[in-house]
Structures are given as structure tokens and as C-alpha cells.
Amino acid sequence: MSVRRKVVGLKFGLMLGIAMAIVGCTDKSDAIRINKESHIVLIGNNLGSRMMNFGHFETEMHLRYPDSLLFIRNMADGGNTPGFRPHSSRNSPWAFPGAEAFQTELAQKSGSIGHFETEDEWLTRLKADVIIAFFGYNESFQGKEGLENYKEELQAFVQHTLKQTYNGKNTPKLALVSPIAFEDLSAKMDLPNGIRENENLSLYTEAMREVAAKNDVLFLDAFAPTSKWYATETEDLTADGFQLNDLGYQKFAKLLADGIFGKHKSVAESHRKLVHDAVLEKNWFWHNDFKIPNGVHAYGRRYDPFGPDNYPYEIEKIRQMTAIRDTAIWKASRGETMDLAAADAKTRKLPEVKTNYRGDGEGKYLYGQEALDKISVAEGYKLELFASEEEFEDLANPVQMSFDNKGRLWVGVMPSYPHYKAGDSKPNDKLLIFEDTDNDGKADKQTVFADGLHLTIGFEFAPEGVYVSQGTNLILLKDTDGDDKADVKEIILSGFDDHDTHHAISAFAADPSGAIYMAEGVFLHTNVETAYGPVRGTNGGFYRYSPQRHHLERTAQLPIPNPWGIAFDDWGQQFFAH
């Protein structure tokens, strides 16, 4: 065991040990019963939302109940609280009537506009029988002062939920899940050691236990077990102290399944990989429905005039494709595979979208020397063609470029812009490297560093790899074997908004310290959970992310429509272009 894992605050350690000995991890002895075709919906914060990227909980459930044909959907999102669950295409961020009385510091007019369904409407659409709610992490940063307000907010949420009949027949079974403990990684990374964080997380866990007992709903204490894991495991279980990694989520999946539904054997264990792959496939399509990229046109302020002509059909189709993947999961739990392409071919056909291009002008695209002849440059400057899509067909829709220390040109391309369309092949945007190997001033070699991406509108180099904007996520791509191809992908932070895809975090630029500045445009509502607390922003501005500290901060919030460039002068002043 490392020294880091041995060092625990005495007061906190004694308190935790007593709590674990007395109450275990689950309050209310009655486990929630699984019925055939049970509809299970996850709501809440980043702890729940991030599960969609790993898929272990859903996999565990399908392996334990292969004949139950479970329907599982994840509605969780970064920054959510019981009452505050904002969305760029909703007129109100409040999850239920009266919720505005609690998180009053967040009750700012954010300009969100649209007809995206409310939380209750979504739960009704999904016919929720069981609701698993993850709360308490964001709220814990309000400390002791915010504890009573949180209990009142959670109480109001529970009472509201238990009055609903989302499935049209009876009230939902509700399980409250506490935050996990904060893992001390400070010996390896410049991160908080978790002492203060865990003091607050423990308080908020106990508050959730109290509210659950008062309302006779199931409560799962995730704080105590994860604290024990950190003390006994030889491997890290989080990426940055508060976000579980793959191993962490594998353990967490079993904790959730046991604690909420009771201990059951994984009767389809031999099909785990097949089921896990099917779950991740389903989650990809569900994400493109519930968190639809470019939703400003599907539900938001840009819905008119063209949204009604296009998006209702695409949404219907992607929901059919998601349902097909539910069937694929059920088959996988029996060891069977499914021809997804054949099934997708039977989903609704999308009507032809008529162009609004009027054909004015010649519309001729100039290439090579013909284009250079038309461009005027300042005195003392020279413009030459380095690489073109005529020579490199992957060079389509380039959006950001940068030279590395070897003099190679890296380009992010996004032929999938503006977003994935249901029925098309999955996006295959790329990060490309171009080299001039014979020193003639023109690129003659292309290397695909990464493909299978979606809208690479920002990237920046770092010693540990390349940070890339990917819709709602900031990811890190690593080349661990030196072949100039990414072989590791890590989701660093989530909760960024891609409501208008070309407004999402972009135009990455590093300052002299190695921190990365990122631009964000209007209409967006970003809510990112970090080791230091939630970072929120609306309607344009700029972020600074320090990889050394895993620290994100909002450096400016201003109504900037399309920020497409960031630069620094000799005095370190920032210049923003839009």
C-alpha cells in the first residue's frame, strides 16, 4: 500500500469507520424488485452521466436479468442538482414547480429558449418505473452553510417525484445515491488531498440518508464503500479524485446493482463483452437523441424556419434505431448477435431536404495557383500552398491547425459538420499530421493521428498527448508507442454544451504555462463538474484549463457569437477573434 493511501485524517477516519460499522451502505432493507420489461432511468449529476461512457452498470443489470428485457436510459448531466437542471432549449432550468426557491444563486436569466421536453415530460416519455438519482456532489461545495437548503431541495424533489405516475400506472420506485468519496491523488498530481472535500461529502451523504429515511425511499451510501476502496485498492479508481475511471466504474456497477436491486448472480456472465459492446452502441444513439448535437435547430431558438421540415423525422428515426439496439442488448445477453444494418434499413425514411441555395453567382471554388493569384498579401509576406484536398482527400472542412515542435502541420477536419444525421455512417472526423519530407515547401506525407472523431473544432498539444474538443467532452488522445497514432482516449471533463455545434469549446491555444484557453459561443449552457467544484457558463465566453492541476476556470463571460481565435501578445495579453 502506498504512503498516500495510508495517510488519512484521524478524525475523518474514525467518523467514517463508525458510520460504516453502523449503517453499511444501503438504508431501507427492501431492495427494488425487477419486473419483466422494467424501465429504469438514471437522473442527476456527472457521476451518473459519465456512466454512459463506460456502460458497466447497464451491462451488469442485463447480465443479472437477461430474461427481463430491461429498458435503461441515462438522463443525468453535469452540474445538475435535485431542482436545477438547465438546458439550452428549455425556457426554465427548474426541474419541478417550486425548485426555484432553493438554488437561488443560479436563478439568473440565461436566455435559454425552446421546446425541449421538461424532466417530467421525458420521464413520462420513457415510462419510468424505477428512478436512480445521483445528487450531492455539486451541492457539497456550498459546505455546512448550504446543508439545510440542500435537504429542503432534496425533500421537495422526493415529494414531487413520489406524486408522479410516469409509467401511467403507479408511482415510481426511487433510489437516492450519495456522492462517492474524494480519492487522494495529491502525491501523483497537483490536486486537492480530499480532506476538506470528504468532510463536506460526508455531511451531504448523511443529509441524503436523513431525507430518504423521512420519505421511506431507498438510499445507497456510495461514500463509505468508495472510501474503503481507496484505502485497500492498489490501483487508482478515479481519474482526478472525483471522477471514477474504468476500473472504478466496474466496481461501482456492482455496488449499485447489489445495493439497489439486491445481490443476484450474473447468470449471463459468459456474454459480458458482447453485452457491454451492445450497451455502448445503444448509449451512443441515445446520447444523440437526449443530448442531440446542434439542438438549437431541433428544439431551440433556431428551430424556425427550417427545423420543422427536418428534425422531427430525424428524431423519430434515431429513436427507432435506439430501440433496435435495446433488442440487440437482449439478444447479446443470450449470446446472440443482430444484423443492425438490416434492422436500421427498416426504420422510417427521411424526406428529401430541399436546399435554400438560390444559385446566385458563379459559385466556383478556386484551387492552387488560381486561388493564390486572387489573394493580396501585405508587403514583406509570401503565401504558398502547403497542402490541398486535391492531393489529400482527408483534408475536408479543416477547422483548426497548429505546428508541432518537429515542424509538422496538424489539422483538425470535420466532414461530419454540422452534426451526425440519423441513418448516416457514424462520424469519422480526423486529426491529421502533414509533413514535408523532401524540403520543397509542400506536404508530401499524411498521417492520421486519430479518426472516428466528431467535430474537432479545437485541439492543443501537451506533453501527455493532445487535448481535443469533442462535443460535450474535453478528451485527451495519447500515443503511447510513438507511432504517431493515438491509442488511448481519456474523457477529461464533461458537461460542455454543443447545442450549436460550431459554438462549442474551440480555437484552443496554450499560454506559456501550458494551460489551454478555449472559446465558447452564444446560446450554450455549460455545466462542468471539476475537482474544485462546478464551473458554469452561459451565452459565450472563454475557459482556461490547467492540465497540471486538472483545473478549469471561466476567465470571461460575454455575449460573443462565434469566437474562432485566441492569441497572446508579448505581454501575455489575450486577444479574442470572432
Q: Could you tell me what each predicted segment is?
A:
Residues 34, 43, 54-55, 92-151, ...:
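Oxyanion-hole/transition-state-stabilizing segment in secreted/luminal serine hydrolases
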Residues 348-578:
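Beta-propeller domains with acidic blade repeats across secreted/periplasmic ectodomains
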Residues 46-50, 77-83, 130, 137-142, ...:
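Solvent-exposed loop/turn segments at secondary-structure junctions
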Residues 184-222:
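Substrate-gating cap/lid alpha-helix
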Residues 35, 52, 236, 240-364:
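Conserved catalytic region of serine esterases and O-acyltransferases that act on ester linkages
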Residues 39-43, 71-76, 129-135, 173-178, ...:
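Structural recognition of the beta-strand scaffold that forms the well-ordered cores
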Residues 25-79, 83-91, 119-127, 131, ...:
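Serine-esterase "nucleophile elbow" of acetyl-processing enzymes
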Residues 11-21:
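Bacterial N-terminal signal peptides
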